[in-house]
Swiss-Prot record:
This is Small ribosomal subunit protein uS7. The gene is rpsG. Belongs to the universal ribosomal protein uS7 family. It holds the Pfam family Ribosomal_S7. HAMAP family: Ribosomal_uS7_B (MF_00480_B).
Length: 156
């Protein structure tokens, strides 16, 4: 029996402008040093930029980009008799969404020049078109899982 109490997930309030839980989580992932207002401004500006460039609703482009960057399967190392195998496992939906958000933010931060809102908008637009670094990372993850399909029976 575990000695520590179970850690329960905190309920995250939806964001103020679009009333979206997913967007609220994204803002929290983007936030650095507790600067939530700055993170909100960056995300809302990025959504406005995406909406103008695509002539669609910015939130729809955001959701499509996030969906395209979301992985379905990943590999986890599993040690079996002295050898470490990369075992493919299915990703829980909440973890998959978190991974996609993390990859998009990382790719946007890596881009050079311009404001963060513009870089984030550019990365999201590319992700919504099945391009960009975040989608490439998802494809890489899927390829790795496909290559290690032989070890799927080591799943736990």
């Amino acid at each position: 029996m575990p000695r520590r109490a179970r850690k329960f997930k905190r309920a995250v309030a939806p964001d103020s402008r679009y009333n979206s839980l997913m967007l609220s989580n994204f803002i929290n992932k983007l936030m650095m040093h507790g600067q939530k207002a700055t993170a909100q401004r960056i995300v809302y500006d990025a959504i406005d930029i995406m909406g103008k460039q695509e002539n669609k609703e910015g939130l729809a482009v955001f959701e499509q980009g996030l969906k395209n960057a979301t992985p379905f399967i990943e590999v986890k190392p599993r040690r079996v008799g002295g050898a470490t195998y990369q075992v493919p496992i299915e990703v829980r939906p909440d973890r998959a969404q978190t991974m996609a958000m993390r990859w998009i933010i990382k790719a946007a931060r890596k881009r050079t020049g311009k404001s963060m809102a513009e870089r984030l908008a550019a990365e999201m637009l590319e992700a919504s078109r099945e391009q960009g670094a975040a989608v490439k990372k998802r494809e890489e993850t899927h390829k790795m899982a496909e290559a290690n399909r032989a070890f799927v029976h080591y799943r736990w």
